[in-house]
A protein has these predicted regions:
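Extracytoplasmic/cell-surface-exposed regions of Actinobacterial cell-envelope-associated
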Residues: 2-4, 64, 78, 105, ...
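Loop/turn elements at helix/coil->beta-strand transitions in domains of secreted/extracellular proteins
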Residues: 1-2, 33-38, 76-82, 114-118
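Conserved beta-strand segments of the P-loop GTPase G domain that flank and frequently precede/overlap
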Residues: 41, 84-85
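Surface-exposed charge patches
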Residues: 27, 72, 108
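Conserved SGNH/GDSL esterase-like catalytic core that processes O-acyl groups on lipids
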Residues: 1-68, 90-95, 137, 146
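Catalytic His-Asp segment of secreted/periplasmic serine-dependent ester chemistry enzymes
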Residues: 22, 48, 86-165
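Surface-exposed amphipathic alpha-helices with a cationic face
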Residues: 67-75
């Protein structure tokens, strides 16, 4: 089976709705039986909370440290961890140059750190080729941030199911 333990409006390390992903990681992931794989797709709300470039840089570093902590804990339990890049958000209420820089920093780390067992590049799958900082026009729900039904379908259809064998 599949467990989706994402919470709308949640953050990895600070604020957001409900306990942070890092706070609930042991309970939500490590305490579950027979977990073999984990996809981490979280961080946009942390980045969206930044009010300055300095804060955005700090949040990017905190996200990377939190991902690293979750990866290490999961690996210690024999769980394969797949990192998913953060979707484009230009045109949304989160769109500022410093938040874009933080997203780019985090996505670069997800893609190139070699900490994850594999990377699911949702950024690449969902971005507009004519403006790579924006989500494809017909793939969001009107806010340039959240995928719509077609967007989620596109994301799902582009996950390599061979990762789960």
């Amino acid at each position: 089976g599949v467990l989706n333990l994402g919470i709308g409006g949640n953050c990895v390390v600070r604020g957001g709705l409900g306990p942070t992903a890092l706070e609930r990681f042991d309970r939500d992931i490590l305490s579950q039986s027979n977990v073999r794989w984990l996809i981490i797709l979280e961080g946009i709300n942390d980045i969206g909370s930044a009010k300055t470039q300095e804060e955005a840089d700090k949040i990017a570093a905190e996200l990377i440290a939190a991902y690293d902590e979750m990866i290490n804990k999961a690996h210690a339990k024999g769980i394969l961890v797949y990192g998913a890049t953060i979707l484009p958000f230009a045109g949304s209420f989160y769109d500022t140059p410093y938040r874009q820089t933080a997203r780019d920093t985090v996505n670069e780390w997800i893609r190139n750190s070699r900490q994850f067992d594999a990377v699911i590049d949702f950024d690449k799958i969902m971005r507009n080729p004519d403006d790579v900082k924006t989500i494809l026009t017909d793939m969001h729900d009107g806010d340039f941030l959240h995928p719509n039904q077609a967007g989620y379908r596109r994301m799902g259809e582009n996950v390599n199911l061979g990762l789960f064998k």
